[in-house]
Structures are given as structure tokens and as C-alpha cells.
């Protein structure tokens, strides 16, 4: 009997335990059913996730030696290039260089990077993968400075296609040398080139070419420069030879620039022309106004020197004559000649005054003879001198054999002259005064200087423009 009771008790406990577990299982099952994701929130399979025990890398980078070029030992690998110019930042005449920002893209095929894909879609990577695979070693020939942009991260993109084709793109700013010819400056045009070349691989290992010919170079239509007009962008290619290493493929990005002349017309040509014209003002100033004419000449000479110095400060020191040098120095010569012209006028005027002073010193004293109608002159005076004093024409002078020892000069200061004759004498004296104070050199200079300067400008602009 005790044995039966124990057995019944055990069975009862088991039944109670089974009944107690049934609601809990149902409750957990209900929770699992409510936590099932809807098809709207169903996520795609993450192919980058490494499953435990079954590693499946996307690119078998570790299985190959990427220090070697693709198809090493075989024919040269073709690498296509295209460029999109984002901006032409600056042109420096002093340093003879230019700065350009561009997108540089390379295209090649590396079978070691091929991967199976049912959708035939490419995979895009950032710059971290570039350090693990082979990429072309293209560099800029004659570059002074260059860098890859790194804001907010390195501006490098690598795109790999299932068949192994690779697109490698980066955003670069480069400062390169440009051989400029300033013989026609500022009426010049400059042609600059950005040159690309493989650093290590000759044409036997790497064939560098423009991927789409002339269409491989794209430019932004908004590119503009303050002093230049961009006329043309075009591409070329050729082989470059180095005596130590051999032949290399070299690609050229050529662009032609034409300088805007309006800036230099305002800053250089127009001020120089004004200074030359200002120097002509001295020809209309009385030659006895020494301070006015001297100060005007010095001012124009110093201003021309300042203009020439300012132009040379913004240009490289070249060993040949530029077009602007010809214009400025010819203008400087015109200004300097105007100063020399006044020096000649002043010198000749001084000589004339000395002769007149000596002539007046030979005249006898006229004290007490102011109302006299005539006066006696010594016979040592020439007939022209006596004639000029008396105011008679040459026809009234006696022949030499009939001339007495003393010459009688009738003075014009006679109180008995009629009023009409006095007015005529005053007009004649006024004309004689103007003629004597307007030197002949000044009169000719007023015409000669402008005429020669106009002829020079016609020749200059017809040759250089």
C-alpha cells in the first residue's frame, strides 16, 4: 500500500508539471509570432558579412601579388585617361606657371580583381583599397606643386566591375610650369600644357592613351579669368624619350589664353599717353616762365618713370624687349625731348637777350632829347640796326656810297603824330612783342611733337594688335 501511494504521488506531480508548462510555451510562441518582421521591413542580404566558418571575401586581394602590373611579362597594359577641368585658378607671369583643379580618371582591366556577379553590377570603394592593389603611376611632368583634396575625406574613388575593369578617379589641384613668351605683352597670347606620364613603366609595359580622343577632355563652361580669355582646350599625345630609361607615353592638355587688353589700356597706355600730351603744354607757356615749364617737365618725366617701374615690377625679368617696353620708352623719350626743347629755347633766348643788351649799350645818351624828332648815331652801327630802331623799310636806306658818316634816325616818339598813326604803331608793337616772346622752336614743336607721336601710335597698334 505505501508503494502505491508513492507511485500515485509521483504521477500527480508529473501531471501538474506538464500542465504548468503548456501556457508558458504558448505565451513564448505568441511572442515569437508577433515579432516576425513584415515584408515591408525585410532587409536585403548583407553580402559583406563574414559568416563564421565560411569566409567569402569580395575581392581576393590577398591571393595575388599586386606589386606587379596586370599581365606581367605580356604585352603593354592599355590605360585610358580622361580629364574634367573644374577650374583654372590662376596664371602667374612672374613665376611662369598656372594652377588648375581637375578630375583625373584612369581606365584599365585587371583580371585579378574579377568577381562573380549575377547582376553584373560594379562595386565602388574609397581610397583605402588603392593601397592594396595595383594602380597606374601617372604623374604630372613639370609640376611644381600638386595635391589630392582630402575634405571631408580623400577625394579618391575606385570602381571595380565583375569582368575586372577598373575606374580610378581622383580630384587634384596642380601647379605646373608654362613657358611664356612676352615679346608681344600685353597684346600676347599664351599656350600652356599640362603633361601626364607614367613614372616607372615605359611604353613596353604601359600604354597611356586618351580614352575618347578629343572628347576625353571636358571643361566647365563657367571657367573664366580676370586677365585672360580662354580660347581653346585640346588634347595631344606623343612619346617622350629619356636616355637612361627609354620611351614613355606622354599625354598633353593644351589650352590657349589671350590677354584682356582693356585692363592695360587703363593702367598703362592711357596714363602714358596723358603724360606725353601734358608735356606738350609747356610749348604754350611763355619761355620766360622758367619755374612753370621746368616743374612741368620734371613732373612728367618722374611720372613716366613711375609707370615704367610699376609695369616691370609685375613682370618677370626677361632679356628681350616687350611691346609695352617699346610704347613706354618711346613715350618717355617724347616727354624727355620736351624738357630738352625748353632747354634749347631758354639757351637761345639768353643769347638773344645778350645781343640786345650789347646793342642797347652802344646807343648814345638821350638825356634831354625826349621831344626831339631826330638823333645822331655813330657810323659804327650797321644799316639794319639803324633801320630797326627807326622803323623804316629797307628801301629808304641810302646807298653805301651816298651814306654820310653819321646816320640820322627819326624817332617814332613824336608828339605830332596823328592819332590814327599812333594806333597803327601800337598794333605793330603788340604783334612784334608777341612774335619776340613766342620762340620759333616752340611754334614748330606744337606741330612736330603731336604729329610724330600720332604716327608712332599708328605704326605700333598696326604691328602688335
Curated annotation (Swiss-Prot):
* One function term, GO molecular function aspect: transmitter-gated monoatomic ion channel activity involved in regulation of postsynaptic membrane potential
Localization (cell): Postsynaptic cell membrane; Cell membrane
Does the keyword Cell membrane feature in the UniProt annotation? yes
Identify the residues that bind 4-aminobutanoate: 105, 169, 197
CDD domains under this entry? LGIC_ECD_GABAAR_rho, LGIC_TM_GABAAR_rho
Q: Which residues lie on this side of the membrane: Cytoplasmic?
A: 282-293, 347-443
Signal sequence span is 1-20
Reaction catalysed by this enzyme: chloride(in) = chloride(out)
Q: What processes in GO biological process is this protein linked to?
A: chloride transport; gamma-aminobutyric acid signaling pathway; visual perception
Q: Please list the residue ranges that the record places on the Extracellular side of the membrane.
A: 21-260, 315-325, 465
Per the record, membrane topology reads: Multi-pass membrane protein
List the SUPFAM superfamilies hit by this protein, alphabetically.
Neurotransmitter-gated ion-channel transmembrane pore (SSF90112), Nicotinic receptor ligand binding domain-like (SSF63712)
Expression by tissue? Expressed in the cerebellum.
Q: Which PANTHER family has this protein been placed in?
A: NEUROTRANSMITTER GATED ION CHANNEL
- Purpose of the protein: Rho subunit of the pentameric ligand-gated chloride channels responsible for mediating the effects of gamma-aminobutyric acid (GABA), the major inhibitory neurotransmitter in the brain. Rho-containing GABA-gated chloride channels are a subclass of GABA(A) receptors (GABAARs) entirely composed of rho subunits, where GABA molecules bind at the rho intersubunit interfaces. When activated by GABA, rho-GABAARs selectively allow the flow of chloride anions across the cell membrane down their electrochemical gradient.
Quaternary context: Three rho subunits (rho-1/GBRR1, rho-2/GBRR2 and rho-3/GBRR3) coassemble either to form functional homopentamers or heteropentamers. Rho-2 is unable to form a functional homopentamer. Interacts with SQSTM1.
Q: Which family does it belong to?
A: Belongs to the ligand-gated ion channel (TC 1.A.9) family. Gamma-aminobutyric acid receptor (TC 1.A.9.5) subfamily. GABRR2 sub-subfamily.
Q: What is this protein called?
A: Gamma-aminobutyric acid receptor subunit rho-2
Q: Name its species.
A: Mus musculus (Mouse)
Amino acid at each position: 500500500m505505501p508503494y502505491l501511494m508513492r507511485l500515485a504521488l509521483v504521477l500527480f506531480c508529473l501531471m501538474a508539471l506538464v500542465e504548468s508548462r503548456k501556457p508558458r510555451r504558448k505565451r513564448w510562441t505568441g511572442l515569437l509570432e508577433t515579432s516576425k518582421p513584415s515584408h515591408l521591413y525585410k532587409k536585403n542580404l548583407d553580402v559583406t558579412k563574414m559568416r563564421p566558418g565560411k569566409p567569402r571575401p569580395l575581392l581576393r586581394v590577398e591571393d595575388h601579388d599586386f606589386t606587379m602590373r596586370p599581365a606581367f611579362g605580356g604585352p603593354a597594359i592599355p590605360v585610358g585617361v580622361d580629364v574634367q577641368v573644374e577650374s583654372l585658378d590662376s596664371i602667374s607671369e612672374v613665376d611662369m606657371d598656372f594652377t588648375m583643379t581637375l578630375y583625373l580618371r584612369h581606365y584599365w582591366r585587371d583580371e585579378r580583381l574579377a568577381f562573380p556577379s549575377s547582376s553584373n553590377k560594379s562595386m565602388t570603394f574609397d581610397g583605402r583599397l588603392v593601397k592594396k592593389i595595383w594602380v597606374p603611376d601617372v604623374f604630372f611632368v613639370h609640376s611644381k606643386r600638386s595635391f589630392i583634396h582630402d575634405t571631408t575625406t580623400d577625394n579618391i574613388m575606385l570602381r571595380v566591375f565583375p569582368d575586372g575593369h577598373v575606374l580610378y578617379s581622383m580630384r587634384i589641384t596642380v601647379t605646373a610650369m608654362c613657358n611664356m613668351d612676352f615679346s608681344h605683352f600685353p597684346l600676347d597670347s599664351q599656350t600652356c600644357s599640362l603633361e601626364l606620364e607614367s613614372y616607372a613603366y615605359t611604353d613596353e609595359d604601359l600604354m597611356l592613351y586618351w580614352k575618347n580622343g578629343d572628347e576625353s577632355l571636358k571643361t566647365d563652361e563657367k571657367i573664366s579669368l580676370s586677365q585672360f580669355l580662354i580660347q581653346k582646350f585640346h588634347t595631344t599625345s606623343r612619346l617622350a624619350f629619356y636616355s637612361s630609361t627609354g620611351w614613355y607615353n606622354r599625354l598633353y592638355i593644351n589650352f590657349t589664353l589671350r590677354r584682356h587688353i582693356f585692363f592695360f589700356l587703363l593702367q598703362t597706355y592711357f596714363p602714358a599717353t596723358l603724360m606725353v600730351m601734358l608735356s606738350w603744354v609747356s610749348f604754350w607757356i611763355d619761355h620766360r616762365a622758367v619755374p612753370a615749364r621746368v616743374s612741368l617737365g620734371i613732373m612728367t618725366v618722374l611720372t613716366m618713370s613711375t609707370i615704367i617701374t610699376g609695369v616691370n615690377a609685375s613682370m618677370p625679368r626677361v632679356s628681350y624687349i616687350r611691346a609695352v617696353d617699346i610704347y613706354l620708352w618711346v613715350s618717355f623719350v617724347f616727354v624727355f625731348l620736351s624738357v630738352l626743347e625748353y632747354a634749347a629755347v631758354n639757351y637761345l633766348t639768353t643769347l638773344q637777350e645778350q645781343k640786345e643788351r650789347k646793342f642797347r649799350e652802344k646807343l648814345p645818351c638821350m638825356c634831354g632829347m625826349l621831344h626831339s624828332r631826330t638823333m645822331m648815331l655813330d657810323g659804327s652801327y650797321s644799316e639794319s640796326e639803324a633801320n630797326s630802331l627807326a622803323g623804316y623799310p629797307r628801301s629808304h636806306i641810302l646807298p653805301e656810297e651816298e651814306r654820310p658818316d653819321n646816320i640820322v634816325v627819326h624817332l617814332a616818339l613824336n608828339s605830332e603824330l596823328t592819332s590814327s598813326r599812333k594806333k597803327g604803331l601800337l598794333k605793330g608793337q603788340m604783334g612784334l612783342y608777341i612774335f619776340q616772346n613766342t620762340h620759333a622752336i616752340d611754334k614748330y614743336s606744337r606741330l612736330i611733337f603731336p604729329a610724330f607721336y600720332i604716327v608712332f601710335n599708328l605704326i605700333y597698334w598696326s604691328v602688335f594688335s
